[in-house]
Amino acid sequence: MCVLFSLLLLASVFSLGQTTWGVSSPKNVQGLSGSCLLIPCIFSYPADVPVSNGITAIWYYDYSGKRQVVIHSGDPKLVDKRFRGRAELMGNMDHKVCNLLLKDLKPEDSGTYNFRFEISDSNRWLDVKGTTVTVTTDPSPPTITIPEELREGMERNFNCSTPYLCLQEKQVSLQWRGQDPTHSVTSSFQSLEPTGVYHQTTLHMALSWQDHGRTLLCQFSLGAHSSRKEVYLQVPHAPKGVEILLSSSGRNILPGDPVTLTCRVNSSYPAVSAVQWARDGVNLGVTGHVLRLFSAAWNDSGAYTCQATNDMGSLVSSPLSLHVFMAEVKMNPAGPVLENETVTLLCSTPKEAPQELRYSWYKNHILLEDAHASTLHLPAVTRADTGFYFCEVQNAQGSERSSPLSVVVRYPPLTPDLTTFLETQAGLVGILHCSVVSEPLATVVLSHGGLTLASNSGENDFNPRFRISSAPNSLRLEIRDLQPADSGEYTCLAVNSLGNSTSSLDFYANVARLLINPSAEVVEGQAVTLSCRSGLSPAPDTRFSWYLNGALLLEGSSSSLLLPAASSTDAGSYYCRTQAGPNTSGPSLPTVLTVFYPPRKPTFTARLDLDTSGVGDGRRGILLCHVDSDPPAQLRLLHKGHVVATSLPSRCGSCSQRTKVSRTSNSLHVEIQKPVLEDEGVYLCEASNTLGNSSAAASFNAKATVLVITPSNTLREGTEANLTCNVNQEVAVSPANFSWFRNGVLWTQGSLETVRLQPVARTDAAVYACRLLTEDGAQLSAPVVLSVLYAPDPPKLSALLDVGQGHMAVFICTVDSYPLAHLSLFRGDHLLATNLEPQRPSHGRIQAKATANSLQLEVRELGLVDSGNYHCEATNILGSANSSLFFQVRGAWVQVSPSPELREGQAVVLSCQVPTGVSEGTSYSWYQDGRPLQESTSSTLRIAAISLRQAGAYHCQAQAPDTAIASLAAPVSLHVSYTPRHVTLSALLSTDPERLGHLVCSVQSDPPAQLQLFHRNRLVASTLQGADELAGSNPRLHVTVLPNELRLQIHFPELEDDGTYTCEASNTLGQASAAADFDAQAVRVTVWPNATVQEGQQVNLTCLVWSTHQDSLSYTWYKGGQQLLGARSITLPSVKVLDATSYRCGVGLPGHAPHLSRPVTLDVLHAPRNLRLTYLLETQGRQLALVLCTVDSRPPAQLTLSHGDQLVASSTEASVPNTLRLELQDPRPSNEGLYSCSAHSPLGKANTSLELLLEGVRVKMNPSGSVPEGEPVTVTCEDPAALSSALYAWFHNGHWLQEGPASSLQFLVTTRAHAGAYFCQVHDTQGTRSSRPASLQILYAPRDAVLSSFRDSRTRLMVVIQCTVDSEPPAEMVLSHNGKVLAASHERHSSASGIGHIQVARNALRLQVQDVTLGDGNTYVCTAQNTLGSISTTQRLLTETDIRVTAEPGLDVPEGTALNLSCLLPGGSGPTGNSSFTWFWNRHRLHSAPVPTLSFTPVVRAQAGLYHCRADLPTGATTSAPVMLRVLYPPKTPTLIVFVEPQGGHQGILDCRVDSEPLAILTLHRGSQLVASNQLHDAPTKPHIRVTAPPNALRVDIEELGPSNQGEYVCTASNTLGSASASAYFGTRALHQLQLFQRLLWVLGFLAGFLCLLLGLVAYHTWRKKSSTKLNEDENSAEMATKKNTIQEEVVAAL
């Protein structure tokens, strides 16, 4: 059958002589599971084959095997079920297209597919080859083809293709990523041809240097399937992005600072081969990426560039301006100048100086105001312009000063200053001194009577009585043994090259001289001695006369007048006269003795004068303050904290025109015209001078407030009254608020000036006053009495019964009325008494007493007739009233036994008596203070032991059974006495200027106790003595005695009043006591001029003590708790901010504890400084930016913050002082820019600025910044302000990565190369913004483990075993040997079980093992493990093959010790006969010997160093490792060098150095006080002392050299082997000696110069003389020669 089929097929093929039957399809087609694929297919058949019924298309799967039908166009039922619905014939059979589409591919669809088409039974064809289909689950990576040559500027195509293609899939893509979209174009091509099926994307790029290092990624995606492939571009290019980085960016570069310039290249391929540096276009000849200036100088300023070169080319960076921040002063013209010339000083700065420099000029360290330009012009200079000038340049980063330049102005001598003195201390001596001011120095000549006596040029009168000394521009003549001829006129002449001047003075030889010791100006209490000296010869009867203020004070034989304690009365003009026999000296010149004393308590009065002339207001206030002091005190008058007037003349623009101030010495008179309310109050007069201060206060009442009652002060009840408060004030208070007082008590407050009483009631009658409420308070008006008239009210009539001494009744009638009422008392119709005639009754049983509106009637020996109706009538001009009562006489009374006066605890019996006797059945009731006593119903009340609470009024009531009326007894009072109890003693001190102490002792006692007050066992006050008697004992004490109370007032308490007071209370029954401590506050600190001062002012702090023992006081000061030297006062010549602290002084009396004052805080005001402007950004949500400006200022500065030219914030009263805070909510790019902060205060201002960068761009990593290797990571650039057209540039570890519209980087498979720092830049129309770098950490398991070992053979065999590994995170490492753990990284402090020392580092473990036994079994295992995996490695220690050096006794030996170094062979074997050993010291060859030992007997310090040996053995030469030999020795004598600042001696340096091994401990002592040490914890710290301690050296810099820092300093050096010390004097004494030595050198130089000039003149004169003689000899010789020649010529002619 097959043979027949083949024959028929051949016949059909060759029937027409051509091959037209065939099928074309790809050999291979690939697809992905779940996707689809298309097998392109075309077929052909001969043209002459008829097609009548169409063509049947059949696709088979595995035709040679299973032969499953995939497609059957004739009978679809024949299709295998697994292909039904998934296979589709896509071709048109009429067009001979037979494409097969397979959908929903599965892996089992892989295999061979064959196409068969049938036209008829005899015309059919089968594609035997078929198409192989491969279906996989994951796609294979795309195929990338790249050009061979890549270079910058070329355009190249990069092709990426994949065999997977399915047109029916919509989610299929083949894309290039990582390219720059602005310089590249992509195109795509799909091939569905019988020749092949593939999908290709072409990337066309214009290459640039930025493409170097770019990773191109081609990614294929089909539904959920994807694959990718990367290619790394290497584009050769010249260096790009060359720039210079400055190490000192952001601050000033000062002279001497190290500066590093780094040439950074952004990109270069190949690598940079050369870097050249240039400054200002001139090649510096320096190569390398880094240019280091170890010490910046003037010439280092300039514009720097660097040029980077590789094989592709070179690039020069942009110039970087380097400015060395320094200044130099240049002068035009240079050198000394003459007066009236113009001088210009230029403050020159190096090149590349910034434009915003600010200049300041200083002369002699004093700032010149209004000199802020780079040049300083001095037109028409004078001698006052001579001095040292320097300039200061300043910018935002700091300031720097130039070196000083000396400006010398030359001028002729001024008028000389000629003075004369008489010295009679050791013989009569006259001194004449002449000094002059000139430039250059002048020649000074002193003459008398036309005769030159002395000159500073050396032309002197060599008189043995004369002693001459001179200095520059100064001449001093001392004349001994004065004679009358020495009197007369003396003349001083001064001459220099520019002119001369003279002055004259009369000198008298025989004149007395008055000397005052210690000075003509002393402080009160100081001892003063006045001495009288004259030229008279001493005689036995020499007399001295003393005169004070022209009047004879004393006459006697003593030449001295002693004032043991000078007082103000001793001040005056003194002179003396001497008389010796018949000779009398002239009077001495008057000398004024001035005695200084602090201000006494001022006399201060304040009064109001009323002008009775009737012209004008007629009111004026007079304030007069007078004080006694010398020097005159500065007076200040203060009112409500404000200065009203001072004794210093000043213009007060804010003072009232009504105030007139008159000033005299120590007196201040202030007159206030028409005083108003604001002028009232307490005025304080302060007086202060350099020795102390005092004050006094006075109250001034201007009567500016007047109360007026209308219509009258006396009104009838029910009428209307208006009370008006009239206030005379300068500025009306709006709204006004008034306080009204009634009978001295606050009545009402409000804004009404008038209070209306409508209607007026009797209760309104009172004393009224008012005042205006102000902040400082105001005086009350004068009180006004309001009287209210009304008729009498019904009188109050009462009757009292007293039977204590017999029956007595008292009738009292009182009434309320005004005016006073006429009172009459009646019994029935019988008039008993009136207040007009109170003694009207004539009998003595009835007595009447009358007071205002009160009438009292006493009726004694009451009888039944006194019972009846009593009534009282009251009458005045406005009306009358009456009242009545019925009085019945009752017969009971109370009898007390033993007495109503009782002692506490005593028994008492009270009996109820009735006059008619006791009836049977009478009942009794007892009452205490009106309260019934239930426990007693008998006629007797017994109290066994009476107490205080049982004292009071007792009465009884007797009720007879046969009567209805009870008999009520009058009350009887029981008084109970008791011992003193509850003694209290309180001690108070008022703080007003009067200083008043109060001691109050009170007690509960009956009878009143006798009180005694003791102080230190001394009776101070007592109730036994009268107040006058006690006050007379001490005028400062005032005693007030009240019942059971004793008050002691101490006026101006003194130090001796301090202490414990005891109060003792006693009466006849007992005693008690109490104690209290009294603080007199007699020690007080006063601050002059004020406790609030400006920085730089002089401040005096004085310890004021109120004490009667001023001479025996000792003082101690405390500054901020630190004790200072003791003195009554301390002076701060120039107060600093550091001085702003609390001060207190302590005063001690002999034998008593010191008394401390209350602290006083010194407030130092200064201009704003340390202005700082910073900003903070919220890192999470970026919703807030905080701009913070702070400054150091006192008083607090007014801060303003500006953005550009717009003010954005300023400080207010509610702000934190010296702080300004600006919060920017949701900041935008418009908020970025330059912010300026200014600080203003009354003392100055400061400014600073800052560039605000919001940093709104940030890099975010997903899923996190730390991922395991191989995991995908997406790096996103987030910028909330980015526009849609923004471009994103990415940088990795500072290198450009890519740029494009994509805001994210995707790493599908991360590797270690992806780790590092990423940051991005966003470019849009708003500008360019950069993010901060974000770190990406790639985690991976440990790898590349290395276990190594090496030996350290110094003195013993030591092996170091080290294991390292590469891992992230760091691995935990374990080192083991034979299964035993020797070391572990997580036990870094272990000692390896005593085996050796362990060192742990990141991914490294190091073990030092001593005395390792070499040989087998030395296998070590290192294991490293982290969370991602572990790794281990092994290492066997090698056997020892090298020689080593051993030392005996060791390598650290003391100097002088014997030492042997041995060259030890491997294994400890000895040397053979042909061996030799060579020793080396510090790499220098010493010697060779056959023995391996190098001996030192003994070793010295110079032999310390590195030693190693070389052994020449028969087997070859080998060299040991070097060992270090240390020779130990004690310190040598230290070198102590002292440096003192030559200008003013304010700074100094002590430098101590020593040689020792081991290093020495250095200490520096002044006396017994430790000043510094190189052991930091030993030395005390002081702010003005800076200590530096390099090895074996100690340096101490003292910035403020004071007396406490001067003295002998000792530097001591010690180590374990010994110690040594050296000393030197440190202070200004050395500076003074240096200055004296400099002056001596100047004089010697002058003398040497003069001598050289003189020798030169002599030599010149000798030379001239010799030259003249030689010339004459030469002329004579010439003449003789001429004559000789003439003779010879004549002889020749004759011949």
Curated annotation (Swiss-Prot):
Top-rank taxon: Eukaryota
Binding site for N-acetylneuraminate: Y63, R116, S122, N123, R124, W125, L126
List of glycosylated residues: 159, 266, 299, 340, 500, 583, 693, 722, 737, 882, 1090, 1100, 1247, 1460, 1474
Motif (Cell attachment site): 827-829
Side Extracellular, residues: 20-1639
Swiss-Prot/TrEMBL induction comment: By interferon-alpha.
Topological domain ranges for the Cytoplasmic compartment: 1661-1695
Protein name: Sialoadhesin
Disulfide bonding pattern of the chain: C36-C166, C41-C98, C160-C218, C263-C306, C347-C391, C434-C492, C532-C576, C625-C685, C725-C770, C813-C872, C912-C956, C1001-C1063, C1103-C1145, C1189-C1237, C1277-C1320, C1363-C1422, C1463-C1509, C1552-C1611
Assembly: Interacts with CLEC10A.
Keywords: Cell adhesion, Cell membrane, Disulfide bond, Endocytosis, Glycoprotein, Immunoglobulin domain, Lectin, Membrane, Repeat, Secreted, Signal, Transmembrane, Transmembrane helix
PROSITE patterns associated with the record: IG_LIKE
Transmembrane segments: 1640-1660
Recorded family membership: Belongs to the immunoglobulin superfamily. SIGLEC (sialic acid binding Ig-like lectin) family.
Signal peptide, first to last residue: 1-19
Stored InterPro entries: CD80_C2-set (IPR013162), Ig-like_dom (IPR007110), Ig-like_dom_sf (IPR036179), Ig-like_fold (IPR013783), Ig_I-set (IPR013098), Ig_sub (IPR003599), Ig_sub2 (IPR003598), Ig_V-set (IPR013106)
The gene coding this protein: Siglec1
Function (record text): Macrophage-restricted adhesion molecule that mediates sialic-acid dependent binding to lymphocytes, including granulocytes, monocytes, natural killer cells, B-cells and CD8 T-cells. Plays a crucial role in limiting bacterial dissemination by engaging sialylated bacteria to promote effective phagocytosis and antigen presentation for the adaptive immune response. Mediates the uptake of various enveloped viruses via sialic acid recognition and subsequently induces the formation of intracellular compartments filled with virions (VCCs).
Record bears the keyword Metal-binding: no
CDD domains from the UniProt entry: Ig, IgV_CD33
The species this protein was found in: Mus musculus (Mouse)
Residue span(s) of domain Ig-like V-type: 20-136
